[in-house]
């Protein structure tokens, strides 16, 4: 389940051998990003490359709304969002996942309204949450 990937990864990272880690990466097709759009830590120690460019060209939804950005692609959900399974479920139900095209609108109450292209309904997020969701223009 998408909402529990972060918790499981945190458990496994402390008990998995390097050999098992390499095999899992191979079985998964050598991914470089988590399902939340963040680089998988430690890949450079397994022969992969470090993903330092994941911050390039992205801005939080809070900053995007304040700067007048009205659309963008959801790129990543940072750790404060990943540790809340209920929030992750709500975001996934609304289509707020990496790769989704979003319309962004600031709300007067400090919330950010997000509508995913092709979805009937959007979701309003408080700035405390929206600041941990990143988009690329």
Predicted regions and their residues:
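Amphipathic alpha-helical segments within well-ordered protein domains
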Residues: 6-10
